[in-house]
A protein has these predicted regions:
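Tandem CBS (Cystathionine beta-synthase) repeat/Bateman regulatory domains
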Residues: 1-142
């Protein structure tokens, strides 16, 4: 069973983050530039929240607010569910499903060391299942 640390090693463990006092517009620009759907919100070295495209849609667009004038802290999701690098992909899938999450920050010693998305987890699961199928087919064929 694959662990998060292996997933991060394969996909890269770049941490895309924004400060809580940054404008939502700047966070959106960074998400677009990095082709990601969420950013960690970090104050100093501490994870204080997460901001996603969904937060923007629901808390800025639908409320007719300005992304240039709204700080990230006003729309971010605080109290983020996190995982450690030794967590299994299955545990992450369960957390995402149970909590209706699309992104999980990875913390090691209280420091953000990466982020996994539900898409990353699905790809890893499919890859692992494909490998199992290939092994079984090889065994059957001889």
């Amino acid at each position: 069973m694959q662990q998060v640390k292996h997933l991060l090693a394969a996909k890269g463990n770049a941490v895309y983050a924004v400060a809580p006092d940054a404008a939502v517009y700047d966070a959106l620009q960074q998400m677009a530039d990095k082709n990601v759907g969420a950013l960690a919100v970090i104050r100093g070295d501490e994870l204080v929240g997460i901001i996603s495209e969904r937060d923007y849609a629901r808390k800025v667009v639908l409320k007719d607010r300005s992304s240039r004038e709204t700080p990230v802290s006003e729309i971010m999701t605080p109290g983020v569910v996190t995982i450690g690098p030794d967590a299994s992909v299955d545990d992450c899938m369960r957390l995402c499903t149970d909590n209706r999450l699309r992104h999980l920050p990875v913390l090691d010693g209280g420091r953000v060391v990466g982020m996994v998305s539900i898409g990353d987890l699905v790809k890893a699961t499919i890859s692992e299942q494909r490998e199992t199928i290939n092994q079984l087919e090889s065994y059957i064929v001889g």
